[in-house]
Regions:
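Catalytic Zn2+-binding segment of zinc metalloproteases
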Residues: 123-139
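Active-site scaffold of zinc-dependent metalloenzymes
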Residues: 81-112, 138-151, 155
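Amphipathic heptad-repeat alpha-helical coiled-coil/stalk segments that mediate oligomerization
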Residues: 158-159
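Short alpha-helix carrying the canonical HExxH Zn2+-binding catalytic motif
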Residues: 111-125
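Active-site-proximal beta-strand/loop segments in catalytic clefts of secreted hydrolases
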Residues: 23-26, 67-71, 97-99, 130, ...
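Structured segments of extracytoplasmic/periplasmic soluble domains
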Residues: 41-50, 127, 131, 147-150
């Protein structure tokens, strides 16, 4: 059995303002500023978690740590196959897979920019306490469906 989440104990204040920091791991060849700029765009998307009342604020010392990490780091840190990303359920640590960030996931049927949006929203969903869900075939895939692994009869979707 594979575990796709780390378990955390952090709980957000009722204000629903989430302060986060962002890093690109030293073994990942990707410009940090570009990563940060894209994160800010994806987290502020009106169809993302902001539609549920969350506001995301970049703060270099923020309690939520978002990292662009190599597949090897994710495998070691999260105990997962190197083709996935991971986050703590209700926690503070979110690891985005650098290979997926650069190339996407064919099984998701999403273009790269949309896949990145999905990836950020899905993993942030875990930070916010949401677990994986199933889908209703023919309907848009819920953001918490593991679209990286396939759509299970749903249509591709990036909306929360």
């Amino acid at each position: 059995m594979l575990f796709f989440l780390l378990v955390g104990t952090f709980r957000f204040p009722k204000t629903m303002k989430i302060r986060y920091s962002a890093e690109v791991d030293p073994d990942v060849d990707y410009p940090k500023q570009e990563f940060l700029d894209l994160l800010q765009i994806y987290l502020a998307d009106p169809d993302g978690w902001e539609s549920k009342g969350y506001t995301f604020i970049y703060d270099p010392k923020g309690p939520v740590k978002i990292r662009l990490s190599s597949p090897a780091t994710i495998a070691k840190t999260c105990g997962l196959p190197g083709n996935l990303s991971c986050a703590e359920l209700g926690g503070r640590h979110l690891y985005l897979n650098a290979s997926r960030w650069k190339h996407g996931a064919k099984a998701s049927q999403l273009p790269l920019d949309s896949y990145r949006q999905y990836m950020v929203s899905h993993e942030m969903g875990h930070i916010l306490g949401h677990e994986h869900v199933k889908c209703v075939p023919g309907k848009p895939a819920p953001i918490m469906l593991q679209q990286t692994l396939g759509l299970k009869g749903c249509t591709p979707n990036t909306k929360v």
